[in-house]
Amino acid sequence: MGNKDLTVIKRKALRRGRMSEYVAAAFLMLKGYRILALRHRTRLGEIDIVARKGDLTIFVEVKARHGEAAAIDAVSVAAQKRIRAASDLWLARQADQARLSQRYDIIAVMPGRLPRHFPDAF
């Protein structure tokens, strides 16, 4: 497999990941959440989705996998730490930070099925 083939594979994976994030964001909106950020990047890491419902802010990691267990297992302890660190930076910039509660969720996006939301996953 040449470099060109790897580039095509990476591009497809990025496109699939981006599409999964859009699907997850739409799913959250149907559940009454307001999307505050998609693919929010900080110097400490990236958060796929930042959403809010009332005083609850959720930081969501989206995983496109064939099964729920594979999606949950794909969020490593190191990734959880990066997401928490990035969320601390995001929260520090919010004027109403003191009254916000926060939660860390996972959304599994699987082919041919509705997304599965795992609240308080880590």
UniProtKB/Swiss-Prot annotation:
UniProt GO MF annotations: nucleic acid binding
Coiled-coil features, chain-numbered ranges: none
Disulfide cross-links: none
Family: Belongs to the UPF0102 family.
Name of the protein: UPF0102 protein RHE_CH00320
Organism: Rhizobium etli (strain ATCC 51251 / DSM 11541 / JCM 21823 / NBRC 15573 / CFN 42)
